[in-house]
């Protein structure tokens, strides 16, 4: 390994990179260079320990993080690499199952369902479940989302259906008749859900982990193959693992336990997704010989910011690793700047707070800062509305960042509206939206005339279009509407024999929109074309995974996805190039840095939020995670605030609240 590269590391980083055999826990505070440590350790193992790249398994939590890690290693290696396994937990398990599924009686060509698809699946098979309380006669689908969340959490906790049933029967006296009946209904439903998916050759994302656990537990020879294959394991963001993922890591590590995990319990912000902070706290109990190395030199923030963040997170004691392991996690800034104190804006109402923030931003941009230097961080998307209004009134350009939802992009919503029109031509808003598209060349006055006619005649908007000759319109507008109606009828005739994607393609052709999309003139038009292409890619995937890909089924799936807040990601903008104030949630700010940061709306009930109760919680006795002594919801909210503070470069940080 290049000695100059090692010299660039600080002593703590160097010790982590050059650690020999056995388990290693690297506690990497914010801005301490954890990604550098992981990539340098991979290089060290290959060059100095003479490992083959294929003998190293590196796991993380997002495709983006896996891609960045892979790219760094690729660029750093003098001869490149082949067959290295750097991926997310789910991608790794999918790869294993595609190869080994037959060993546990599964079809290797299973289809993977997203959130909305699992909802559809459960609704379609709801009456195959022996449900009473959880399928009320008046509203049979009332508990569908709650059941799915319940099943997902059971998988996070590595609880099998048989284990659930056994627990209910063994505790019948303590539970009482009513509770025993409810829990037995849930346990049986969980069992039925798993059996139905196996019959239909489908899986949800939680199955990827649990099925690989099943494979390794029931086929020890296959587990040994993978243990021998991977001489070293590296796990990034270990604080985000759930119980099932932790068990997978433990099995793969085996007796040799050449395992490096990088974590920071103070940055555990995904409990709502099943992450178990106890995995970090209990690591040395599971691996008694583990070495612990703490990275405390911060290369991002000023000491002022780090001190305030540390002061905040102390309130989570004694449940923090620093207390449990009696170590020092206080971060020390490598920057030779003390930094400005955090400023506080206090107002009486939300609207006043938003106006004060907008005024402050105007002042900052008149000095040395540009709009793109500034970020407004909110706890949740729906907390941003007052601030967007205030920024607009002040003439301040802004962009709402984070993973943009494809189904909510205007150009994609137009196409979804057309599918909704075909599914139900009485859907007035859908018809209106489609006719508002520039490609049809109708004015607002034309649409208002049709709307007024429909209201007077007590008919649907589309029916009014069919009677365009009777509407007060000029001849040109009448011809356009007639042409539109003819196109819709042609496409309605195709509903029985064509998929939604194919009909939508005919719409692009017949409307003239396809020609416009392939002849874009601006960057914005190019992005619109890319988003529409992504929609068709997603429709193609849906068609491949479902026998019924009709307009009706596709509209139901998209509606469910939008209702659940799920969607494929749209193309992201070049954030640096856009000279606009950046508005984003704290969770979606991960990996981003801004010179000026506003933490807004810090008021009880919003940040910290009120605890979100699960509709159907798991019994505490079944939870395998060792729960903290304190209020774990409030601790998570503190960690979320700490997470954002400690990732701020800290030239200027402003906190506002009412």
What is each stretch, according to the model?
Residues 1-108, 112, 119, 224, ...:
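P-loop NTPase Walker
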Residues 2-8, 24, 32-34, 40, ...:
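Conserved RecA-like helicase ATPase core segment
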Residues 6-10, 14-28, 54, 104-112, ...:
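Inter-lobe coupling/hinge region of RecA-like P-loop helicase motors
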Residues 19-20, 81-84, 102-207, 230, ...:
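ATP-hydrolysis module of ASCE/P-loop NTPase motor domains
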Residues 52-63, 84-86, 236, 262, ...:
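Conserved RecA-like ASCE P-loop NTPase motor core of nucleic-acid helicases/translocases
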Residues 89-93, 184-232, 242-248, 358, ...:
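Conserved helicase/translocase P-loop NTPase motor core
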Residues 132-145, 161-167, 296-348, 365-371, ...:
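Coupling/hinge elements of helicase-like and P-loop NTPase modules
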Residues 164, 179, 314-319, 370, ...:
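Conserved helicase C-terminal RecA-like lobe
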């Amino acid at each position: 390994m290049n000695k100059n590269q090692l010299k660039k590391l600080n002593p703590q980083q160097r010790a982590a990179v050059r650690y020999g055999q056995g388990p290693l826990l690297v506690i990497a505070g914010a801005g301490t260079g954890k990604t550098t440590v992981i990539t340098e350790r991979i290089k060290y193992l290959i060059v100095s320990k003479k490992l083959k790249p294929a003998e190293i398994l590196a796991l993380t939590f997002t495709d983006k993080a896996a891609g960045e890690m892979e790219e760094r290693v690729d660029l750093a290696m003098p001869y490149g690499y082949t067959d290295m396994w750097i991926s997310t937990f789910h991608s790794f398990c999918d790869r294993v199952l595609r190869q080994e599924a037959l060993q546990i009686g599964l079809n290797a060509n299973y289809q993977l369902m997203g959130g909305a698809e699992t909802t559809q699946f459960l609704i379609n098979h709801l009456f195959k479940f022996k449900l009473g309380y959880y399928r009320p006669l008046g509203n049979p689908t009332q508990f569908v989302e709650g059941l799915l969340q319940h099943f997902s959490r059971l998988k996070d906790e590595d609880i099998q259906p048989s284990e659930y049933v056994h627990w209910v029967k063994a505790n019948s006296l303590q539970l009482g008749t009513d509770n025993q009946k409810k829990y037995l209904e849930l346990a049986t439903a969980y069992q039925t859900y798993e059996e139905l998916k196996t019959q239909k050759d489908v899986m949800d994302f939680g199955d990827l982990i649990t099925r690989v656990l099943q494979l390794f537990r029931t086929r020890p020879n296959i587990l040994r193959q993978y243990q021998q294959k991977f001489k070293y394991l590296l796990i990034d963001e270990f604080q985000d693992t759930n119980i099932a993922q932790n068990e997978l890591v433990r099995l793969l590590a085996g007796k040799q336990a050449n395992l490096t995990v990088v974590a920071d319990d103070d940055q555990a912000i995904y409990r709502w997704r099943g992450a178990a902070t106890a995995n970090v706290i209990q690591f040395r109990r599971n691996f008694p010989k583990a070495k612990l190395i703490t990275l405390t030199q911060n290369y991002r923030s000023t000491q002022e910011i780090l001190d305030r963040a540390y002061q905040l997170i102390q309130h989570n004691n004694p449940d923090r690793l620093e207390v449990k392991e009696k170590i020092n996690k206080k971060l020390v800034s490598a920057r030779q700047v003390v930094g400005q104190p955090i400023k506080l804006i206090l107002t009486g109402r939300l609207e006043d707070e938003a106006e004060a923030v907008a005024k402050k931003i105007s002042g900052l941009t008149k000095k040395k800062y540009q709009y793109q230097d500034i970020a407004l961080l909110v706890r949740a998307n729906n907390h941003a509305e007052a601030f967007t209004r205030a920024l607009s009134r002040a003439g301040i350009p802004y962009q709402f960042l984070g993973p943009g939802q494809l189904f909510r992009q205007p150009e994609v919503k137009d196409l979804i509206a057309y599918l909704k029109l075909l599914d139900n031509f009485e859907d007035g808003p859908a018809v209106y939206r489609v006719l508002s598209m520039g490609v049809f060349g109708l004015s607002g006055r034309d649409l208002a005339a049709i709307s007024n006619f429909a209201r007077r005649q007590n008919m649907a908007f589309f029916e009014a279009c069919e009677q365009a000759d009777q509407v007060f319109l000029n001849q040109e507008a009448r011809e356009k509407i007639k042409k539109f109606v003819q196109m819709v009828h042609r496409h309605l005739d195709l509903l029985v024999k064509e998929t939604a994607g194919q009909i939508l393609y005919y719409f692009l052709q017949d409307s003239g929109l396809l020609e416009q999309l392939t002849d874009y003139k601006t960057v914005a038009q190019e992005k619109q074309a890319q988003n529409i292409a992504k929609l068709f890619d997603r429709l193609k995937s849906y068609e491949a995974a479902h026998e019924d890909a009709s307009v009706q089924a596709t509209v139901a799936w998209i509606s469910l996805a939008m209702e659940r807040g799920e969607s494929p990601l749209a193309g992201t903008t070049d954030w640096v190039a856009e000279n606009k104030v950046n508005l984003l949630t704290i969770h979606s700010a991960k990996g981003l840095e801004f010179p000026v940061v506003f933490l807004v709306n810090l008021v009880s009930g919003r940040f910290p939020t009120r605890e979100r109760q699960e509709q159907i919680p798991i019994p505490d006795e079944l939870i395998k995670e060792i729960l903290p002594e304190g209020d774990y919801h409030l601790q998570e909210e503190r960690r979320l605030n700490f997470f954002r503070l400690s990732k701020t470069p800290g030239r200027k940080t402003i906190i506002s609240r009412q």
